[in-house]
UniProtKB/Swiss-Prot annotation:
The active site is at D167. Gene3D superfamilies: Phosphorylase Kinase, domain 1, Transferase(Phosphotransferase) domain 1. The lineage of its organism: Eukaryota, Viridiplantae, Streptophyta, Embryophyta, Tracheophyta. It catalyses: L-seryl-[protein] + ATP = O-phospho-L-seryl-[protein] + ADP + H(+); L-threonyl-[protein] + ATP = O-phospho-L-threonyl-[protein] + ADP + H(+). It comes from the Eukaryota. It comes from Arabidopsis thaliana. SMART domains: S_TKc (SM00220). Belongs to the protein kinase superfamily. Ser/Thr protein kinase family. InterPro entries: Kinase-like_dom_sf, Prot_kinase_dom, Protein_kinase_ATP_BS, Ser/Thr_kinase_AS. Its EC number is 2.7.11.1. Keywords: ATP-binding, Kinase, Nucleotide-binding, Phosphoprotein, Serine/threonine-protein kinase, Transferase. This is Probable receptor-like protein kinase At1g33260. The modification Phosphotyrosine is found at Y226.
């Protein structure tokens, strides 16, 4: 059975592999691997370390000592098109808060592989999990929000053609050893429009299962407007970002693993109060919503928490046209969150 690999994450920053070729116009230094290289990296796919959905994840080694994880999908034409789309997007992207493409394999038929940098702290969802031994400090949470907003601003407003990510969520935000964030997984991304894209005209003739496969986004993060209309837009990304900010402030999951309740539903009254009062909210309610694991940190500025909640609330507004752009969010956080000063020169893109 043929297969393709969609993700390789490297553990160190050094790599002795020299680029063998790159696509015309692509980011320099991206290595093109052969399928023999891919098999060698995984020792012929001998070390399975995880599975999920349509994929299996194998342990791999690069240059004999650098650990990597390879995410392998059962091959199909549809999955190959997803791979090709993500490859073409990543070859064009170069930003400090977007995961870096280091290499790829593509046989131009049904097999392909993306080699991406490894970030040792895992993803944001794992770090916010209340079972995590390490509590993510407040200033790191504000920095993550700011950096992700910068990444979204880059793909929305500084790329040509512009890009809609399509699946902004905490598990698609990776963290390096200093807890700087990088946006990953562009498999759902849409390219070539400034604000929105209509679904294919052939959608109405497809089976319910086919329609389901075409849907993008994840439970708890997906814009209700997209679910109603099938129109993916930049404002859809801002909705997902708003949910991530709620997670950062509260430490709660986008969808409760215990009750199955969505965070946007359990916080609806708070969001409405913020919007109805033009952003004004009492300190007691702010304290009640703040992650209780942060309550021992007396240095937290509640005005910063209020700013984060305002940003989240405005990103969740309906209709989507009322939501801020990524640039507006970057400007607001830059101006209203003093704790971002610890980022120094990294505060600016």
């Amino acid at each position: 059975m043929s297969c393709f690999l969609s993700c390789v994450r490297f553990e160190t920053t050094t790599d002795n592999n020299k680029p063998t070729s790159t696509e015309s116009g692509s980011v320099s230094g991206v290595t093109c691997y052969t399928w023999d290289d891919v098999e060698s990296l995984t020792s012929n796919f001998s070390r399975l370390i995880g599975t999920g959905g349509y994929s299996s994840i194998y342990l791999a080694r690069v240059s004999g000592s650098i650990n990597a994880a390879l995410k392998v999908h059962v091959s199909s034409h549809r999955l190959y098109q997803v791979f090709r789309s993500e490859l073409e997007i990543l070859l064009r992207l170069q930003h400090p808060h977007i995961v870096k493409l280091l290499g790829y394999f593509d046989d131009s038929e049904e097999s392909g592989a993306l080699l991406l940098e490894y970030l040792p702290q895992g993803n944001l969802q794992e770090k916010l999990n209340r079972n995590s031994k390490q509590v993510l400090p407040w200033r790191n949470r504000t920095a993550i929000a700011f950096q992700v907003a910068q990444a979204i601003e880059h793909i929305h407003e500084k790329c040509s053609p512009q890009i809609v990510h399509g699946d902004i969520k905490s598990s698609n935000i990776l963290l390096d050893k200093h807890f700087n964030s990088k946006l990953c997984d562009f498999g759902s991304a849409k390219v070539g429009f400034s604000s929105m894209v209509q679904p294919s005209k052939t959608t109405s003739t497809m089976s319910p299962r086919s329609k389901q496969v075409m849907m993008i986004g994840s439970p708890g993060y997906t814009d209700p407007h997209y679910l109603r209309t099938g129109i993916a837009s930049k404002k859809m990304d801002m909705y997902g970002f708003g949910v991530v900010v709620l997670e950062l402030v509260s430490g709660k999951e986008a969808v409760s693993s215990e009750r199955g309740e969505m965070l946007v539903h359990s916080t609806a009254s708070l969001i409405h109060e913020i919007l109805d009062s033009n952003g004004d909210i009492g300190e007691e309610k702010v304290r009640q919503f703040l992650d209780p694991r942060l309550s021992r940190d007396g240095s937290i500025d509640l005005e910063e928490v209020k700013t984060m909640l305002r940003v989240a609330a405005f990103c969740l507004r309906s209709p989507p046209s009322l939501r801020p752009s990524a640039s507006q969010v970057v400007q607001t956080l830059n101006k209203k969150i003093p704790s971002l000063s610890f980022l120094g020169c990294g505060k600016k893109e």
